[in-house]
């Protein structure tokens, strides 16, 4: 059977695409997923269902690709969690439903992607959500994804303290972090009503499963896209040790920021010299495949907590965050600070000390990493390096964020909560150089991988897809996931990725929609 559309990867984008494209009964859709599928809530494991647990991120979890990557020159390779299940990373994430900033999308448009300015993407953000707290022109009321913020009287002690401390330092209160002029400290919008992690498998795909024109296949590894000349015609897949070919009129890669560029390179689309060196026949040279790897570096300031302070987190995932603009920065809200308990029986993260950490995320880093093929074997992961904090401006902003955390901890709101600082030590704080060394040794990462198949016009030599997700130089092949974001957003990327999938699905489905499908 030849499908009209094959979607590779049932993650946050893939589930949306499959659900939307199959709304047309004349369009046959095959959704492929390497991980397991749980088609109803009753069979969904608790590690995926409940937002208070991060067990599915563990390296030994069957729902995690459990990749390893390089983060800085002073650290050993780190574990990188990526969802391997229908629902993708949205099925194992922290349930933050925070949009990119207005300026993020205006930058996309300025870089030659004029269909992605803020006014053009706002309707898709609105249509995909039902905001349970705010009713205005910037928020939706009839979408499939519930969005809510925890009311102040329900905030746990350590979350409320961050809010009070930030206000004491003069930062404004931010009642709506998804508003166009947001900034300051407030409750983060979440997509976990009653503590349930609402991935797009639940919000989009499940309601479409009954359609006869939609086929969902789990535990299927995509090995490569097959091309006839420079036209995609199918996907080579593997299941149960056997290799098969499935044919499609259009192939869409939605395998994520690491797996989509990996599949492109295995398919002969990418840096020509590198592919030839691996013995892969070249379909089309695109030097940007795997480059421009963007994410959010995170530094953690840890503090010991007094006896009697409740460190059991709210099982509904309450989160308070401070977003601000670093000194001398021209990019608004380029730092985010959050706080949470490290000691957490609910999440399975139990340490002997009573500890909390302030997490400082660099939301718009200047530096970028890259991804390369390590093997032609599709079972072997690609090699990737975040190259965090190699840029002086990135280090400068992170130093400032760490020092701000120390000032927050000194405020009255924390007097009855904290007893002592654990890290960084006084020695780590003795100078800029010492703090830089500590940061390079300890910095962590978010799971917001972006940019490795970035969108842009054909005149951009590093662009991999055009603004409609179509791979430059290869017919009937698209990439639709976080990898096509030109830069990481100044927010968790989950909401933006869903918006991107909704928008491109509409283009594909429309009669004038830049596709072989009409």
Residue ranges: model-predicted function:
Residues 1-518:
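N-terminal redox-cofactor-binding region of secreted/periplasmic oxidoreductases
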